[in-house]
Amino acid sequence: MYPFPKLNTKPCLLALLVWLIACGTPVYAQKDKKGFKKGGVVQLNDTLSSYSQSDIFRFPNVNKIPFYQDNAKLQKIRALDKPGAEGQMYAELKAYVKNFGIENFSKNVAMIWRLARLSETQGPPGEALLLYKLVLKHHQQGLNINEIYKRQQMIDPDKKENYVPLDFYYKLVEYRKDIDTLRPPQSVLINMGGYINSDKEDYGPTVGNTDDMILFTSKRNENMDRTYNEDLFFSRKAEDYWDDAQPFKSINSKYNEGSACLSKNGKSLYFARCESPDGLGNCDLYVAILKADSTWGDVKNLGPNINSAGWDSHPSLTHSGDTLFFASNRAGSFGLSDIYFSVKDKKGVWGKAQNAGPIINTVQSEVSPFFHHTYNVLYFSSNGHPLNFGEFDIYKSNWYKGGWTEPYNTGPLVNGGGSEYYFTIDSRSKNLYYARSSEEDIKNLDLYSFPVPMEAQPLAITQLKGSLKDPAGKPVKGIVSVIDLDEGVEVAPKYIREDGTFDFNLINKRNYLLIIQGDDFFRIEEIFFMDGETEINKIAEPIESKIAFQSLEFENGKANILPEMHTDLDKIANFLIDHPELHLKISGHTDSAGKEEANLRLSQARADAIKNYLVTEFKIGTVRIDAIGYGSSKPIVQEITDDHKQLNRRVEFEISKQE
């Protein structure tokens, strides 16, 4: 198989094929994006704009021609293989790749690989990374996938390993429940229960516009030959509880029905039916109309402009009713199954199905699209995109300036080690519904519903960037959490990267709490308002084995905790909360003035006061804290002046592992 068009012209053009794959000096540096200061916060480039800095990613020929080839332009690209012409070659190769049809992505992906390497030095910021991802999505035999993956990983900050494991996330959630009873964390990964789910596969949910009815597909019914039959079911919500699911009798037949969606007015039902005599392929898309007597009928096949000789399913209708997204494995697709769409004309006729393109579709499978009508966001399930947590994951992509943005994984609060399909959101963008399976039983799908986490929110497109360094400027390891103070939307916590950086995509114009925790520094907390893309850089305050704070100066002869002590004592408390395996020793010391017996009592009273503050205010177990007063028996300097006495009047904290 030729990675480029097979040419029957001069031998020099055949050499071009090898040259495009092999030549080129490895380069790794990406151009830095420029920022500017505003109100003490660095404002960065708009996320969606940066994704679309190059119109190469629109690929206008995808639905026009199956394969693009221009021998003269290939010769011109070959002629530019000389020192100092990298910029010209980049421009010519980019213009050529831009014209690709669907078949080019299976036969000529090596051109994109070459363009990606050139783009690292010649292209706009971010373009090379998107090109590397494009190669990974469409790679075929003949390319070194490990080398491509290595290049992509070197410049891609978004990795699965950045996310904190789910079990640790739950520990953070339990901690938040204790410290903030007014804003309890929202639950995630909640099974819809026995009123909806069965012991068989349940999937394909769609929610009515009033959010009080759910339609879904189930294999709970058996045919006469004991094979499972796919049928549509529905349930209605009453007082926040779902009724027992009922079969959709007016639509179900002896054939398989599933993957339904309703029009905005609730009068048209689009669904898939398989093995039907009037079908054009294995599974076809149909529409049923709600009649005046409130029964469903007039079932019609959507016809050859939408259906193919293959498998067509998973319809999703826009609220305007003029665009239908669906999945298909028809011939001429990018992969095993692709996302397609059809647009209805003014006469009500559905147009010829069009492929959603190579940014959405991959050489693997893309299924179950859902289009968010308000924010122009396409959600879908895929096993072909570079970042994934399981087999099939849910992704989202924005329609922006005539093209789709690079799909974004909706994160570990949605995606697990199994598979997730059929993502949909209610009318208020509050709750999500989808089908998911466990890693242990990947085929047994159940329906789940819970509040939409931040990574899956349609408006979570504004980037928070930050870093954590020690006083010497070296990166520090830790975990970063972001709390939505306005709406309580859950945000998946992340590890700080090796270079000390972190980032989150958040909803703009909201108040958030940033929390940074680690083993070697005091917890950092900062409330901020998201006003455009923001950067927060912090310096960690390292924890020594023995700590003394200047703020812990008691009034003469007294042991009362003063307000100015709270900040430093809170740091100690938070560190103990973050590290339940640690033990604290509080040592109280005085100077040598006065009687030793009185000094001993005073130092003990001060140590006890601090312990009581930590136990009372932060619920830290008393067994984890020892409070000992030493009086003046352990001076750190010989007392000659009043300054020396002040140094000896101190409270020290020693942190150690519990035995």
Residue positions per predicted region:
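Short, conserved micro-motifs composed of acidic
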Residues: 32-71, 121, 125-127, 131-467, ...
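Bacterial Sec-dependent N-terminal signal peptides
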Residues: 1-34
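Periplasmic peptidoglycan-binding/tethering modules of Gram-negative envelope proteins
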Residues: 455-583, 616, 620, 657-659
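Periplasmic OmpA-like peptidoglycan-binding domain that tethers envelope proteins to the cell wall
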Residues: 382-390, 579, 587-659
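TPR-repeat structural position
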Residues: 86-87, 125
